[in-house]
Amino acid sequence: MARNKPLGKKLRLAAALNSNRNPPLWVIAKTKRRVTRSPARRHWRRQKLKA
């Protein structure tokens, strides 16, 4: 991808990067491992963004 990006695209990519994380450990501990994965996780090669 080009190094010079429009600001809107850069913000969308940053938001997608921040949302692509595991749930916090305190959530896993509080739910007694009932919640261990996030349904919004995305792999960079398998699923592409519409950004």
From Swiss-Prot:
GO molecular function, one term: structural constituent of ribosome
Keyword terms, alphabetized: Ribonucleoprotein, Ribosomal protein
The UniProt record lists the keyword Ribonucleoprotein: yes
An individual GO BP term: translation
InterPro entries: Ribosomal_eL39, Ribosomal_eL39_CS, Ribosomal_eL39_dom_sf
Species the sequence originates in: Pyrobaculum calidifontis (strain DSM 21063 / JCM 11548 / VA1)
Family that this chain belongs to: Belongs to the eukaryotic ribosomal protein eL39 family.
UniProt region (Disordered), positions on chain: 32-51
UniProt name for this protein: Large ribosomal subunit protein eL39
Xref: Pfam families: Ribosomal_L39 (PF00832)
GO cellular component: ribonucleoprotein complex; ribosome
